[in-house]
């Protein structure tokens, strides 16, 4: 098989995200943060797999709106940008 199709040199194992149990009331808030962190790290696929939600999930909108307000208050422009992108995607 051609080396072009072999990924033996890929680094490390899959990302691990710490989340509460799915039936925990704080799961959705934690999932929103994980999705934003995954996007920031260029690994949305792993974050989506870990949470069961896609980036822009409308159900997470209230949590992301809170994160956006926190980011604006803290002057965290990158998190603000990601939260705004999440909210735009969910509005489609």
Regions found by a protein language model. Give the residues of each.
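Amphipathic alpha-helical binding modules
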Residues: 69-92
């Amino acid at each position: 098989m051609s080396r072009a199709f072999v990924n033996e040199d890929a680094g490390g194992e899959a990302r691990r995200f710490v989340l509460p149990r799915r039936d925990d009331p704080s799961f959705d808030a934690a999932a929103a943060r994980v999705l934003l962190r995954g996007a920031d790290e260029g690994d949305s696929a792993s974050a989506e797999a870990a949470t069961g939600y896609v980036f822009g999930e409308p159900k997470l909108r209230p949590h992301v709106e809170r994160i956006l307000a926190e980011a604006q208050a803290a002057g965290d422009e990158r998190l603000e940008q990601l939260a705004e992108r999440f909210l735009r995607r969910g509005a489609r």
